[in-house]
């Protein structure tokens, strides 16, 4: 069995299965005797197939395939994860907004550099995404997602707010994204803008 890496940041971009959904997936795979959908991997790290890999580890007799993909950096990989997950039919509106926002934030980093880090090493990482390029990125994502450029920008703030809320109160991300609690979009975005001690 391949030893693949699970990156928590990559894994956490993917809406988790419920316990019942995971059990059903495991039963179906065991019934088939194989994992038919390949695990998608970048540099030995799983991008898609975390649940299938967990099942494979529990049942090493299962056959499976690995499909390797190539990206220039981890932000391109995150963008791919978000775009791929947006193709799922069973997303809540909150999960969809979060994924669109995460994709936008990742593509800003992939194409515009690390705008927050003072320790970024390459000059490419230190370049800021120009406003015109940010608008082009938002419009491209909006076209892909069937939404508006302004929605993509708001989704970026929403995603940052959800992640900031999770940092302040672990477990709340799942409650927000499943709709168990329904804060306003403005309230979620405000968390991202607040100083860490005020969250």
Feature locations, PLM:
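A short, Lys/Arg-enriched interface patch at domain edges and termini
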Residues: 185-199
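Generic structural signal for secondary-structure transition and capping sites
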Residues: 34, 181, 196-197
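A residue-level signal for conserved active-site and pocket-lining positions in enzyme catalytic cores
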Residues: 29, 49, 100, 152, ...
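Residues within well-ordered alpha-helical secondary structure of globular protein domains
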Residues: 28, 158, 193-194
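Residues that cap or delimit alpha-helices
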Residues: 18, 92, 169-170, 194-198
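Alpha-helical interaction elements
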Residues: 89-186
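Short, charged/polar connector segments at secondary-structure boundaries
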Residues: 1-69, 76-90
